[in-house]
Amino acid sequence: MTAIRGGSRRAPGLALALLGGVLLGACHGDENAQVNALPGFVSGSVRKTAYDGASDDLLTAGLGKTGLGSDTRPGFANPAQPSAAELRRLAIYSNYRALVDITPNGGYGRFWGPNVDLAGNDTLGEGKIAGTEYLAYSDDGSGRKNVTLLVQVPASFDPANPCIVTATASGSRGVYGAIAAAGEWGLKRGCAVAYNDKGGGNGAHEIGTGVVTLIDGTLATASSAGSSSLFTASESSSTLAAFNSAFPNRYAYKHAHSQQNPEQDWGRVTLQAVEFAYWALNEQFGPVVDGTRHGIRYRPGDITTIAASVSNGGGSALAAAEQDTRGWITAVVVGEPQINVRMTPGVTVEQGGAPVPSFGRPLADYATLANLLQPCAAAAVAATGAPYLSALPMGVTQSIRTQRCATLAAAGLVSGADTASQASDALAQLHAAGYLADSDLLQAPMWDSQAMPAIAVTYANAYTRSRVTDNLCNFSFATTNPVTGAVAAPAVSPMTNLFGAGNGVPPTNGINLVFNGASGGVDHRLATPDASFAGAFCLRQLWTANQLGIGTNVDAVRVAANLQHKPAIIVHGRSDALVPVNHASRAYVAQNSATEGRASQLSFYEVTNGQHFDAFLSVPGFDTRFVPVHYYDEQALNLMWNHLKSGAPLPPSQVIRTVPRGGVPGAAPALSTANLPPIVQSPGANAIAVNAGVIDVPL
């Protein structure tokens, strides 16, 4: 590992970095300088590490296709103190598997995977990719932003034909969060990949011990880490000690508790990741100008750069393209983007020629509503046969659904004399709020898996700039007894492997979402018979009553849908119940057509039977009903590459009518091309009409 000196801060624990590293030096400068200089936002040292493509590599951390596909996750020589290299390996393993279906029947190793080349053929063996990584923080001088930036430069990079692909982390994942979604494609194409963790990352603070994570996942105390931690809660040590006495075994998380509303900066930090990649490429391939330092070979706009990723990372790519004033980004390709659009009057979303009931709502609105209603809507007749995605016994889950419906009815929030009618009304309200009937069977698993409660709580904290000590709406993050759900001390601290195994949004890695009642904190699902309705209702009221500054902070994350005439592709699954297509992609495309008019180069591909979590596709009931959106994300990247390099026209906006695998839940037949029709140049009746602020999607 080599470290390149940047700003005045130096992270502690550099001695724990990968063996064989070195430290290099460079000063900050401007883009007109002849000497390559670190961008001013880079703080501390840059860690440079070479990987041989055999024992370790950029894509699989030495695990190869077989290791990534194995259900046995990589271990640690010393489980109590894993090395940075071991944590990196686990992070790549965990994040890769979190975004794609890893089963052979589901397509791994055949349609995607390290062994599959860009033409879709099994030619790459274990798929290990040699190259170099550059790792650093971006900060504003406060030592509290500490956005992780990472650039991977494959050995196959051609300096005469340079390219960059961004891979901003999805969700609130760490810096490797989009390695499967965009990083893999970029590395195989021979491009440098520019990652960042969006300033949310996987940073946590164990309140009882004061332990925090560092940039490489190793641990330190908050006092010794200082401004070099991924995240440290901002409260004083005395305040945290008092909080720990009243609420032991709690954890602060960066996305939820940094008080920075990090989402407002996601576009900016994605642009910084690109600029950092330019610096790294100049450092590696620029001429030597004074015997030691490198000159500038590439200036803004010289490198073909595709802003890509999925979910939150996809929204970040769109925001970056909108904010790009220096020509860093050439094109955009994103999947299922979580994006909050600033809608203007007259913009309309239609399906089959009729206006949809609701569109363009921000996440703070639809997520808090879904979190309130989904446990009840899950009992609706239309949701019968939904995949079951919970470790709780079915009887417990059914009781939660019945009790949530009853409490909603008592509060006047749903109508009906019995559970069935109350559940049908809850589902009807979700339809009226813009959720498609295509996602009816996903309302239950989105809540049962705790995806929606996790999002509602984390984003409510972020949008209100709450502190961990606020216990917003009586929710907090804690370790719990696996049987009773009550807050309890962990047998082993989850911090040890958090960087490698966590996803940044509790519940994750043994840190759970708890509701703090009169008898203490308990897993929110078990704290009350109606699964902490009071907390869910409180979260909803934050939005509906515009409390604690939530409206202002949500406005700060909205975008204008102005891509500045850059070629772009959005792919989204129609059945998405986490980021509903009416509120995200359809709304964005409609607003873009109003903003850019005929100058827009945006194509939108809506995938029937596609939903948000490809990693769920091996779950019984998911396997038979839903198809991988990732397959079309990769097709879209290939289409954009051909457009940029050979002038091939981008196919027009269209609905892609996929065919579910069918069969028996849990034993669906193998995925084949019969399930996955191609994106076509002439979609005919499947064409999506977009004009002057109106999008009309065929039924």
Curated annotation (Swiss-Prot):
Q: Which GO terms describe its cellular component?
A: extracellular space
Q: Which GO terms describe its molecular function?
A: hydroxybutyrate-dimer hydrolase activity
User: EC number(s) on record?
Assistant: 3.1.1.22
Q: Which residues form the active site?
A: S311
Subcellular locations according to the entry? Secreted
For this chain, the family text in UniProt reads: Belongs to the D-(-)-3-hydroxybutyrate oligomer hydrolase family.
Protein known as: D-(-)-3-hydroxybutyrate oligomer hydrolase
